[in-house]
Amino acid sequence: MDITIQHPWFKRALGPFYPSRLFDQFFGEGLFEYDLLPFLSSTISPYYRQSLFRTVLDSGISEVRSDRDKFVIFLDVKHFSPEDLTVKVQEDFVEIHGKHNERQDDHGYISREFHRRYRLPSNVDQSALSCSLSADGMLTFSGPKLQSGVDGGHSERAIPVSREEKPSSAPSS
């Protein structure tokens, strides 16, 4: 069986049965006009694709930063409260889990759950890790790095999520 593989630049919209946001995390938040009529963009040009109106950090996608002095993870969890979130460090990984039971929203009843796992750099000071949730729903997990390549120590422990009253200062990409 021959399968044709196309470069993404030459991909055309596949019609209303294959919406372009199939794997995005906007479940239960309504649709944009181009979600309902994706074939219109391909009639203009096969290479044209409308951009999303939301920023990367507003779409549930995380941002990981690691520089000389610290390691930081930004994650949009606006649908979860601190009580719904669990943050654990196991060995070289941080695991962030969020779950809330079924509740009513504007569109009916909904329940949400996610699980993210990130590898920590070996020189992160695991005893000084912190996690906070801003007023606009941005989870910030951070920890300082140790100097001169010292190993940060490995153990399993839970990191409490504290609530901040101000919106996040995370830059939108």
From Swiss-Prot:
Positions where N6-acetyllysine occurs in the chain: 70, 99
Modification comment: Acetylation at Lys-70 may increase chaperone activity.
Residue numbers carrying N-acetylmethionine: 1
Region (Disordered), start-end ranges: 144-173
GO biological process per UniProt: lens development in camera-type eye; negative regulation of apoptotic process; protein refolding; response to heat
All copies of domain sHSP, residue ranges: 52-162
InterPro entries: A-crystallin/Hsp20_dom (IPR002068), Alpha-crystallin/HSP_16 (IPR055269), Alpha-crystallin/sHSP_animal (IPR001436), Alpha-crystallin_N (IPR003090), HSP20-like_chaperone (IPR008978)
Example GO molecular function: unfolded protein binding
Biased composition (Basic and acidic residues): 153-167
Keywords, in A-Z order: Acetylation, Chaperone, Cytoplasm, Eye lens protein, Glycoprotein, Metal-binding, Methylation, Nucleus, Phosphoprotein, Zinc
Binding site for Zn(2+) 3: 154
Modified residues (Deamidated asparagine): 101, 123
Phosphoserine sites (modified residues): 45, 122
Superkingdom of origin organism: Eukaryota
Binding residues annotated for Zn(2+) 1, in chain numbering: 100, 102
Intracellular or extracellular location(s): Cytoplasm; Nucleus
Binding site for Zn(2+) 2: 107
Positions carrying Deamidated glutamine: 6, 50, 90, 147
Glycosylated residues (UniProt): 162
Chain segments carrying region Required for complex formation with BFSP1 and BFSP2: 1-63
Stated role: Contributes to the transparency and refractive index of the lens. Acts as a chaperone, preventing aggregation of various proteins under a wide range of stress conditions. Required for the correct formation of lens intermediate filaments as part of a complex composed of BFSP1, BFSP2 and CRYAA.
Family affiliation: Belongs to the small heat shock protein (HSP20) family.
Assembly and binders: Heteromer composed of three CRYAA and one CRYAB subunits. Inter-subunit bridging via zinc ions enhances stability, which is crucial as there is no protein turn over in the lens. Can also form homodimers and homotetramers (dimers of dimers) which serve as the building blocks of homooligomers. Within homooligomers, the zinc-binding motif is created from residues of 3 different molecules. His-100 and Glu-102 from one molecule are ligands of the zinc ion, and His-107 and His-154 residues from additional molecules complete the site with tetrahedral coordination geometry.
Name of the featured protein: Alpha-crystallin A chain
Organism for this UniProt entry: Artibeus jamaicensis (Jamaican fruit-eating bat)
Gene name linked to the record: CRYAA
